[in-house]
């Protein structure tokens, strides 16, 4: 009895809770990083054309952009014995587990269900890829909100998101490393099966372990029921009335969308410049990262993804994919190293020099990848892009913090910003609780890790709860419901949306470009070209007060 009580107290300790929550962060990033590496070659192997393969990769980001606001609003108003966040985390985790089962077994399931398995195999594989990408990226939203709920004190908030960023990086490293191993010749092959079955079986075990850790998270201890604002009559909902919850979530979403559209359209010029520069930089980097393994397998190793298993062409392609996975692992490792020293680099050279150097380094690395036929040079170039990855994770959000610390200087035309309404006039509705103020932004997404443990600027976590919110009045017409007010978190979320948008455009167009050019080198050429465009827009970013006079002239 005493031992059980001691274990219970140990698990409820703040550091233990921090580790338990961030275990899921680690598991999510392992699955997403391995998916980014392995899914494009897998789609090509089953006969999906290049242009359609890239479109499949865009399903998850597009659905994420649409569904994240609804999920954030629904999570904020959820009431249940397991808290507000974990039911959504578990539901999305089920989608991830289903995708990890479907992807390596699509052919086997199709053969069981119909005599002509090819169309069904493609459909099941696309369903699995879409589920993995969508559920994996969207699951970060309630997870980050859970961290914010549990660690409200500013100091604890910064520590929580430092550990969060580290687990993102660690998960990315492992996720990129696992596909680089030849599992067909490993000791696990007799038990788990082929390369795909071994890899996705391990991912399932890792992810199940990480999800199980959330069962021990004491969410209720840190999160009580949200009371309606004083003077407002919120509708009373039965804790088991799911239709009522759904109606409330949709109603709040309807109130949010017009307000968010208004806020985005009125984005100040300084933030707009930063958003465009970040979008172009992320588009270049994601074009490189999404299609790097396919480029190495087809372009560098001269393999053929659609060749029969066991043939020389297929063997070369598989070797190239494993070498590409190693290159992305090095990218993640270099990103982690630069994140750890980013603060010193900025203090030594300044934000402008470090940011421009990181953006300029990318087209150099991508250009070397296009021109060289050496595996060592191409792998080293992939590792160099980790510098760009690290800078994009951190510096744009530091600049946004600077803008908000000196609003009168950098954001003089912030119309309608009254500093927020009183608590008697508003009900807080969370929207897009992305990487929070007080931590390097991991962008989890999705795709890859590499934020590191850089101590964040104090101004980034000044509030007790690091969430993105807008104020919505309850029980009023739509026009009267919106209360003026715009904080740093909303602008950070808008900047963070550049990451999701950066995956959509390459997914739509890169396949067609490669088919027209008849060469996978077009992936790297396009990435280098986008990198050059990003350099131009990076030079237009406002880094200090002197830039305001220069760009307004």
Curated annotation (Swiss-Prot):
Keywords: Membrane, Symport, Transmembrane, Transmembrane helix, Transport. Induction: Up-regulated by androgens. The keyword Membrane applies. GO terms for molecular function: sucrose:proton symporter activity; sugar transmembrane transporter activity. It is a multi-pass membrane protein. Prostate specific. Expressed in all prostatic glandular cells. Expressed both in normal and cancerous prostates. InterPro entries: MFS, MFS_trans_sf. It is found in: Membrane. Belongs to the glycoside-pentoside-hexuronide (GPH) cation symporter transporter (TC 2.A.2) family. This is Solute carrier family 45 member 3. It comes from Homo sapiens (Human).
């Amino acid at each position: 009895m005493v031992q059980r009580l001691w274990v219970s107290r140990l698990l409820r300790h703040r550091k233990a809770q921090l580790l338990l929550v961030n275990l899921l962060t680690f598991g999510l990033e392992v699955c997403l990083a391995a998916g980014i590496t392995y899914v494009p070659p897998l789609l090509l192997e089953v006969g999906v054309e290049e242009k359609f393969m890239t479109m499949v990769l865009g399903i998850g980001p597009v659905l994420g952009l649409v569904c994240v606001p609804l999920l954030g609003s629904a999570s904020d108003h959820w009431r249940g014995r397991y808290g507000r966040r974990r039911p959504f985390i578990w539901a999305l985790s089920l989608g991830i587990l289903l995708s990890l089962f479907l992807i390596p077994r699509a052919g086997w399931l199709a053969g069981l269900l119909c005599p002509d398995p090819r169309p069904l195999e493609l459909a099941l594989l696309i369903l699995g890829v879409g589920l993995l990408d969508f559920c994996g990226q969207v699951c970060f939203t309630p997870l980050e909100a859970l961290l914010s709920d549990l660690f409200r004190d500013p100091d604890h908030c910064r520590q929580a998101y430092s550990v969060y960023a580290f687990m993102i990086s660690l998960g990315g490293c492992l996720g990129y490393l696992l596909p680089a191993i030849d599992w067909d010749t490993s000791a696990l092959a007799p038990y788990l099966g082929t390369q795909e079955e071994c890899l996705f079986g391990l991912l399932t075990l890792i992810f199940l372990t990480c999800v199980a850790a959330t069962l021990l998270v004491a969410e209720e201890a840190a999160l009580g029921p949200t009371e309606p604002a004083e003077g407002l009559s919120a509708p009373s909902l039965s804790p088991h009335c799911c239709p009522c919850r759904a109606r409330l979530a949709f109603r709040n979403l309807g109130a949010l969308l017009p307000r968010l559209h208004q806020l985005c359209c009125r984005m100040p010029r300084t933030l707009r410049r930063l958003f465009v520069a970040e979008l172009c930089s992320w588009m270049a980097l994601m074009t490189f990262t999404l299609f790097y393994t396919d480029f190495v397998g087809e372009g560098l190793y001269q393999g053929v993804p659609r060749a029969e298993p066991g043939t020389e062409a297929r063997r070369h392609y598989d070797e190239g994919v494993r070498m590409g996975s190693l290159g992305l692992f090095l990218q993640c490792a270099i990103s982690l190293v630069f994140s750890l020293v980013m603060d010193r680099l900025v203090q030594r050279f300044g934000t402008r020099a470090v940011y421009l150097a990181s953006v300029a380094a990318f087209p150099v690395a991508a250009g070397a990848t296009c021109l060289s036929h050496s595996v060592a040079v191409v792998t080293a170039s992939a590792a160099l892009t980790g510098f760009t990855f690290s800078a994009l994770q951190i510096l744009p959000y530091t600049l946004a913090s600077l803008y908000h610390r000196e609003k009168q200087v950098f954001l003089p035309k912030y119309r309608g910003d009254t500093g927020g309404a009183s608590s008697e006039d508003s009900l807080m509705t969370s929207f897009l609780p992305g990487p929070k103020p007080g931590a390097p932004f991991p962008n989890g997404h999705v795709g890859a890790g590499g934020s590191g443990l850089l101590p964040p600027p104090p101004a980034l976590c000044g509030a007790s709860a690091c969430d993105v919110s807008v104020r919505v009045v309850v029980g009023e017409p739509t026009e009267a419901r919106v209360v003026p007010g715009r904080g740093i978190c909303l602008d950070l979320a808008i900047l963070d949306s550049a990451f999701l948008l950066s995956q959509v455009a390459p997914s739509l167009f890169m396949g067609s470009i490669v088919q027209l050019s008849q060469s996978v080198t077009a992936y790297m050429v396009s990435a280098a070209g986008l990198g050059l465009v990003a350099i131009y827009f990076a030079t237009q970013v406002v880094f200090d007060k002197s830039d305001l006079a220069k760009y307004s002239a």
